[in-house]
Amino acid sequence: MDAFKTHLAIVASGAPLSREQARAAFDDLLSGEVTPIQAGAFLTALSVRGESEDEIVGAVSAMRARMLPVAAPEGAIDIVGTGGDHSGSYNVSTLAAILTAACGVPVAKHGNRAATSRSGAADVLAALGVKIGLPPEALARCLSEAGLCFMFAQTHHGAMRHVAPVRTELPFRTIFNMLGPLSNPAGVTAQVFGVSRPAWAEPLTRVLATLGSRRVWTVHGSDGLDEITTTGPTAVVALEDGAFRHFTLDPREVSLPLATLDDLRGGDPEHNAAALGAVLEGARNAYRDIAVLNAGAGLVVAGAAGSLAEGVARAQEAIDSGAARGTLARLVAVSNA
């Protein structure tokens, strides 16, 4: 492991790794050939200095090379966030994914159990009856028959087991909190990507572009949410076929009322599942508003809506027509078949 020690020494000195060096270092980390002390020192030094774009690209490349892939139809997207906003909000991206799929855009959702919240995507979907941890063939069938699948990160990124104990011991977030959301097993090239730190928005959008994404909205709410928020404005860095654009969204621009963080605060998986089901049954509340806003963005990124207002209107109709309820029912049925 002389090469890893060399890379560790570079990072410990405060200097950045090249993309190729980062790829090699993360190949070593994910192969289980690095001692816990070396891994902890490496991740700590990276976190203290801050990861460069080349380091993130190299690390994601190592992750993607080891992941269990899923075959997805052309035009599939993901709606995902880095987590870590400590808001305890409802499962916004999960409901937004259901609404987007109900509008005819295939969604290959990638996620995990709760880390800093009480209910992650895997937790709430399991509470809704969706079978979690399916193999790639079953996930492809979910996409084909329901227009939506949920790829459980632990199933697709088995190499993460080599660094999991070290991550648990460290009292801060590491680069791996970014790598999961950046490593979609279906290889989607369009994403609504939420970040909990505003400083991550532009560099992670460039990282996604480097890795092959074509259309991305990287979003950060003014309240700290890693979603498009309804409590105020949201900063967006958009990637559209190689061009970058910065703008701010306000929910009132698409006729949605302002909410408070308390309005968006959820609970445990059963509580959040009940709230999600209530929205699909027609409840009009802050959870519905923030979900249709994020689904509207998903439709824009997918090229299925010409504007955010059009996307929001289509997401509203997916609820009111019962299409979204049907999408979830099909996902439950197909995942358990």
From Swiss-Prot:
E.C. designation(s): 2.4.2.18
Binding note for cofactor: Binds 2 magnesium ions per monomer.
GO (cellular component) term, any one: cytosol
Disulfide bonds listed in the record: none
Catalytic activity: N-(5-phospho-beta-D-ribosyl)anthranilate + diphosphate = 5-phospho-alpha-D-ribose 1-diphosphate + anthranilate
Pathway: Amino-acid biosynthesis; L-tryptophan biosynthesis; L-tryptophan from chorismate: step 2/5
Keyword terms of this UniProt record: Amino-acid biosynthesis, Aromatic amino acid biosynthesis, Glycosyltransferase, Magnesium, Metal-binding, Transferase, Tryptophan biosynthesis
Cofactors that this protein relies on: Mg(2+)
Binding site for anthranilate 2: R167
Binding-site list for Mg(2+) 1: S93, E227
Job of this protein: Catalyzes the transfer of the phosphoribosyl group of 5-phosphorylribose-1-pyrophosphate (PRPP) to anthranilate to yield N-(5'-phosphoribosyl)-anthranilate (PRA).
Subunit structure and binding partners: Homodimer.
Family designation: Belongs to the anthranilate phosphoribosyltransferase family.
Name this protein carries in UniProt: Anthranilate phosphoribosyltransferase
